[in-house]
Swiss-Prot record:
The record marks 81 as: Interaction with target DNA. Its cofactor is Mg(2+). It comes from the Bacteria. It comes from Rippkaea orientalis (strain PCC 8801 / RF-1) (Cyanothece sp. (strain PCC 8801)). This is Endonuclease V.
Length: 229
């Protein structure tokens, strides 16, 4: 997969904030894609006491959700762990993994936030703007915003609101299990993002895309045995 993105690594938090403020103006909050044949999940893990960043991508056919390709890339970790700035720590390895793909996805589901972020530029939005592809944020925990209690049955959701703005939804992806946090990444509307996340769910809390990517990213070895995942 050809990647034309130029990634800027900030040298200070102020510079990082400036980059986020500039890039958030480029986020597109409406559907800008046509046929979807492949969806991908992206997740990041760390090795060697966080000295190495390991990005994993799982590409699945859509709507059958059959795993068709996986790629992993590992790079030295160059940015510290700071909540709200994780994209600067994780995106370099993600871009390297994307470059290895032979099957380009039509939509990417990221393990993390989209616009459900203090400066409206979580990793899904940051990545989406850089590579100019539709992305969705699918997070396991809340970063910012408030919401009402979500009914316990699968498929129910409540809007996630911050400063009077709907920044995503809190979605019950599995009955009686903790919800997930879905937000626009780039080039997709919120209703469409919810729909694709729901279509990527099976019997687990996480969509199949990010569930596969999570297993790959957390693998400590260099070789991945897919038969054991």
């Amino acid at each position: 997969m050809k990647i034309k993105a130029t990634f800027s690594c900030p040298h200070s938090l102020e510079e990082a904030k400036t980059i986020q403020e500039n890039l958030k103006k480029k986020v597109i909050l409406e559907d800008q894609f046509s046929e979807v044949n492949y969806v991908a999940g992206v997740d990041v893990g760390f090795r060697d006491n966080y000295q190495l960043t390991q990005a994993a991508i799982a590409v699945l056919s859509f709507p059958k959700l059959e795993l068709v390709e996986t790629q992993i890339a590992c790079l030295p970790t160059t940015f510290p762990y700071i909540p709200g700035f994780l994209s600067f720590r994780e995106i370099p390895a993600i871009l390297k993994a994307l470059e290895k793909l032979k099957i380009p996805p039509n939509i990417i589901l990221c393990d993390g936030q989209g616009i459900a972020h203090p400066r409206r530029l979580g990793i899904a939005s940051h990545l989406g703007v850089l590579i100019d592809l539709p992305t969705i944020g699918v997070a396991k925990s809340l970063l910012v915003g408030k919401h009402e209690e979500v009914p316990p049955e699968k498929g129910n959701w409540q809007p996630l609101i911050d400063k009077g703005e709907i920044i995503g939804v809190v979605l019950r992806s599995r009955t009686n299990i903790k919800p997930i946090y879905v937000s626009i990444g780039h080039k997709i509307s919120l209703p469409t993002a919810i729909d694709y996340v729901m279509q990527c769910l099976t019997k687990y809390r996480l969509p199949e895309t990010t569930r596969w990517a999570d297993k790959l990213a957390s693998n400590k070895g260099n070789m991945i045995n897919l038969s054991k995942i």
